[in-house]
Amino acid sequence: MKTALVFAAVVAFVAARFPDHKDYKQLADKQFLAKQRDVLRLFHRVHQHNILNDQVEVGIPMTSKQTSATTVPPSGEAVHGVLQEGHARPRGEPFSVNYEKHREQAIMLYDLLYFANDYDTFYKTACWARDRVNEGMFMYSFSIAVFHRDDMQGVMLPPPYEVYPYLFVDHDVIHMAQKYWMKNAGSGEHHSHVIPVNFTLRTQDHLLAYFTSDVNLNAFNTYYRYYYPSWYNTTLYGHNIDRRGEQFYYTYKQIYARYFLERLSNDLPDVYPFYYSKPVKSAYNPNLRYHNGEEMPVRPSNMYVTNFDLYYIADIKNYEKRVEDAIDFGYAFDEHMKPHSLYHDVHGMEYLADMIEGNMDSPNFYFYGSIYHMYHSMIGHIVDPYHKMGLAPSLEHPETVLRDPVFYQLWKRVDHLFQKYKNRLPRYTHDELAFEGVKVENVDVGKLYTYFEQYDMSLDMAVYVNNVDQISNVDVQLAVRLNHKPFTYNIEVSSDKAQDVYVAVFLGPKYDYLGREYDLNDRRHYFVEMDRFPYHVGAGKTVIERNSHDSNIIAPERDSYRTFYKKVQEAYEGKSQYYVDKGHNYCGYPENLLIPKGKKGGQAYTFYVIVTPYVKQDEHDFEPYNYKAFSYCGVGSERKYPDNKPLGYPFDRKIYSNDFYTPNMYFKDVIIFHKKYDEVGVQGH
């Protein structure tokens, strides 16, 4: 009883120091609800002309006076003129931000929206652009503007896979949904149909289609690129992004590691990195069609890269060599030839990652280029090197890039540069890794089960209607999606005093695909972060109980557009209440993919926990709106990353076993089983 009272007191103290994100839900007022409703309606059937007459009237051709109500450089009127006078990408054509002309126009539109002086100007500009610029460009620029404008904080976007399903759902599924809708056109009724997804096993890569084609995974990457577009100039827009480059590295490093664990569960070896001299063996048919009916390019197997209209292969190799030279010399040079140390400057990792991504914070974009994006363009256009077809391939859309197996081979090459840099950093000493007075006594993990399930998805937006009276609800059940049974784990910590600590949880492989046990230094590259959170431990023993739902890397399942709009509309009409959740993050990793697929007889993994000192970085550290999903998505602008250690610590540097194992960490062998849905006994599904 005494122990229970002490534990309750500790829990109460923790709640006071690190408030639960539920405390940050605020009741939305009518002004906010109007904004939220406006945004949802602007995304309604964006691939066709607006059928909502009030927005059409608001969006009539804007006057010079209206376009001057913006602080966009050089002037709103000039930018508006470029977009309005037929110079922009026309509607009905595919859009890709990786194409320079498309990107320039998208930035112009973003500037018009972002620099609008007030919400009224912002909304009118959006209504104007909704029917007058390319629909893909509108979705892209408008989404990013909603994320970054101060007066839109808390406003949420509808799921991208519902707004524009053509980049998320196989075209045969969309075609069948359109056929079903035609049979019931204009009825206004709800129709749900089960449409099986064809994961035909033509190659090894098809074994992983349940993972790479998961709409939540691809929505996660879409939102990440909306938060941190490579063209985003932090100086111009006045937003500081803490650890921007390092976050880019870590996010894609984690995605790759997660992909690797799925390969293990399917008895597949690791992939080889891309080599210029070897053919690209992985064929890929995206099975996607743009809304205008054009098919996304198909890549045959065993093709060699060639020069293309944007770059010569020699140019890309030169940029790559310059980055390697910077790693070897230890310095990167900016546009004024000022050297920046990669090893003796606290921002060294930032300089390198910004150079490799080629974002606008790069020390010298014109000298170091953007080899990450160049790789994608080089292989993406391997079947159309001179853009004769004019269609963007899967590697040049944030919505589709993770579906293509070559992405992971390209990342393997990119990661080689990062590891070359990391391997020159000094290893962590025993004293650096240890936490004096703190020991993880035990970790107890509940049973881990994965399963495949059918899940509902609305394809309302994939059908064309003439007016609001023709709108019918079209739902499909897509099979299959990987999911897991919720699980708990307990971490038993002893401490010589009461103090704030930081807990990080990882999951990694134990054996390779042939059943050989991994050396820790080899498998450190494949540990995926499961959770990261602050905690207050008392003197003596503390048991930390954690549920998989609590994970700070995940985003909850998104409401469908239809459900979301209904909630907002009813609250606007005073029929219900709507709360703005500051702890919600668009960009979080999908909850259904938190753990990799198991096997019927079980797949062995290693559960790893490390407890480190909590070092305060900012006065708002770990307020829920500041840290939810920050490990994969960063903390946004004008916020400090709530940890002083490198991302991925302590697996980010070489490991020497004799010094690595310390009392404040714990390795636990776990088994993940894969069962049929009806064998798992999941509640609430």
From Swiss-Prot:
Transmembrane segments: none
Gene3D superfamilies: Di-copper center containing domain from catechol oxidase, Hemocyanin, C-terminal domain, Hemocyanin, N-terminal domain
An example Gene Ontology CC term for this record: extracellular region
Subcellular location: Secreted, Extracellular space
Domain of life: Eukaryota
Pfam family, one: Hemocyanin_M
Cross-referenced SUPFAM superfamilies: Di-copper centre-containing domain, E set domains, Hemocyanin, N-terminal domain
Glycosylated residue positions: 233
Signal peptide per UniProt: 1-16
InterPro entries: Di-copper_centre_dom_sf, Hemocyanin/hexamerin, Hemocyanin/hexamerin_mid_dom, Hemocyanin_C, Hemocyanin_C_sf, Hemocyanin_N, Hemocyanin_N_sf, Ig_E-set
UniProt keyword Ribonucleoprotein present: no
Cited PROSITE patterns: HEMOCYANIN_2
MF (Gene Ontology): nutrient reservoir activity
Keywords: Allergen, Glycoprotein, Secreted, Signal, Storage protein
Job of this protein: Larval storage protein (LSP) which may serve as a store of amino acids for synthesis of adult proteins.
Family (UniProt): Belongs to the hemocyanin family.
Protein name: Allergen Cr-PI
